[in-house]
Amino acid sequence: MLFKPKENSNELNEKKIVDHIRCLGIDMINEAKSGHPGIVLDAAPMLYSLYGKHMKINPNDATWFNRDRFVLSAGHGSALLYSTLYMAGFGLELEDLKQFRKLASLTPGHPEYKVTPGVDMSTGPLGQGFATAVGIAIAEVYLRNYFKKKNHDIIDYRTYVLCG
C-alpha cells in the first residue's frame, strides 16, 4: 500500500487518511488565506483511491518513465494534490505545505511540473489539463505500439485526469 503511516504513529485506516488529506489541504488554504476548499473536501477520496489503490507510481522515483500519470486539470485544487503527495510519501514536508502559494515554494498556487515531486503537468485554466492528458494518453498508445513492433513490451502506463 502506498500510504504508510509516518514514524511513531499507529496504523491509519482509509477514512483517517482521507480525513488527513482534507485537513492538511484546508489548513494550507487557511494559512495562505487563499485557495479553493471545495475540491479538497469533495475529491480527497478520489485521489486517495487513485494514488493508494490504482496508480502504478514510485514516490522515491517520481519521474520513472513507465509510471502512471495524474493531471489535475482543475489546477486551482492544488492544495488537494499537495496534501495527497505529502501523505503518499513524495518527499514534501509539512514545512513545504505551510509555504503553500508563496513565491519560490514547492507548493505554488497551481501545480508546476519540475517544481513539485509527483506533479506530472503544470495546470491552471480549467480544461487545459484535460487536453494535455489526452495528448499524454495518445503518446502512451503510440509508444506502446512502436516498441511492440520491435518485440519490446516496455510501455504500459495509464493517464488519469481530474477535471473541475
PLM features per residue range, with description:
Residues 18-34:
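N-terminal capping segment at the start of a domain
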Residues 29-35, 116-121:
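Active-site flanking loop/helix segments enriched in acidic
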Residues 16, 35-41:
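Structural motif
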Residues 12, 37, 123-126:
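Conserved, non-catalytic sequence blocks in retroelement Pol enzymes and Pol-derived host proteins
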Residues 42-164:
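Cofactor-binding active-site loop characterized by glycine-rich and histidine/acidic residues
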Residues 1-14:
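Basic/polar N-terminal segments that are highly enriched at the extreme N-terminus
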